[in-house]
Structures are given as structure tokens and as C-alpha cells.
Amino acid sequence: MGGFLVLNSSNNVVRTVPSKKRKHPEYKSKIRELISGIRSDNLREAVRLPQGVDINEWFAMNTVDFFNQISLLYATLEEFCTQTTCPVMNAGRYEYRWADGTTITKPKTVSAPKYVEYLIDWVETEIDNEAIFPKNPGEPFPPNFEDFVKRILRKLFRVYAHIYYSHFHEIVALNEQAHLNTCFKHFLLFVSEFQLVDKEKEMAPIKSLVETMLDQ
């Protein structure tokens, strides 16, 4: 998925579906392009529901946007996050097992790169499903759309937790920490604004970082 999400002049949501090709030499410039429109001093205002915009549309466009961001950020770490270096998807003592409720119903232990591979394929399938993410303006969202969004965002948070816990030194070496921090703060403010990720249960592995970012 490589698109960007905006409100046009009529305050209608423009949603784009990303490309499945994540490995590309321009990923760093793509990250900078993605981040360029996000100013750290206006993130709290940026996550609020704009007047006249349907909340499900707002959830949909931001979910796709956050997925784009974490996909690009993780792409910078693929040479460091391997089956050997990260045989279990975790954030410290917290292990994240994979299940999608459809093809894999029983949570299973997987490596971090395998977890992210499963996640990307699963999210793309969800977003491509027009019964969940309708593509045309005015088409109704399913009554339980917020539940789909919560599931996606909860799993995206786990990738952030793994990156911060296991790969922050590589992020610093790549000089990408400002981009990572801006994306993560944007994500945190959004999920906190609409209570989409359980702070006590899901955010415990990096609780102090979460609290610091939300207090800034």
C-alpha cells in the first residue's frame, strides 16, 4: 500500500490502497515524503475528527495511513530483524503470537519477521475487502467496523513495541529516530483520542515511553 490520505477541498475523504511491494530502494525518501506533512507541533489537532467527516471514514483513512507508515519504517529494518536475530515476536518479556481468526485461528509463536509478514498480508486483505473497507464515497461501513479497526491498530502497535524494544539502536544508526518518533506519537495520539488500543493491557511493554510521548 503506498498511498497517502487527505481531505480534499470539499472535506471528503480520499483513501488510497497501498501496493504490496514493500521492498524498494526509495523507502527512505518515501518515509520522508510521508512524514513531511506531519508537524510534531500540530499532531493533537491533526487526530481530531474534522467537522462534517463521518467517523468511520476517519477511522478508515487513518488506519490505512498508519499501516503505510509502519510498513515503510519496518522496511528499513528488514536486514536487522531476521529469523536469527528475532526468533520470537516480542517486546521484552511480552510475546506476541499470531492469529488472524480465519486462516490461523489458534495463536502460534512465530519470529518477528514472520509476524510482520503475516500482518501485512492480513491487513492488505482486510483493506481490499470492500465489505469491510468500502471504496466508494457514501457506501456504508459494517456496523462493527470499529472492531476491525481496533484489531488492526492493536497489531500495528505491537510492531512499534518490537521496534522500540529490539531495534532502536539500529534506527538511531540509520538516523531515522525522528521519523519513527513522529509516526509513533501520531499513532498514539490517534488511538488515545478514540480509545482504540487498550493502554493498560496492550501498551504495558513500553508504558514509560507511551506516557512520555502522550505527555509531551
From Swiss-Prot:
InterPro entries: MOB_kinase_act_fam (IPR005301), MOB_kinase_act_sf (IPR036703). It holds the Pfam family Mob1_phocein. Belongs to the MOB1/phocein family. One of its GO terms (cellular component) is nucleus. It comes from the Eukaryota. Zn(2+) binds at residues 81, 86, 162, 167. This is MOB kinase activator-like 2A. One of its GO terms (molecular function) is metal ion binding. It is found in: Nucleus.
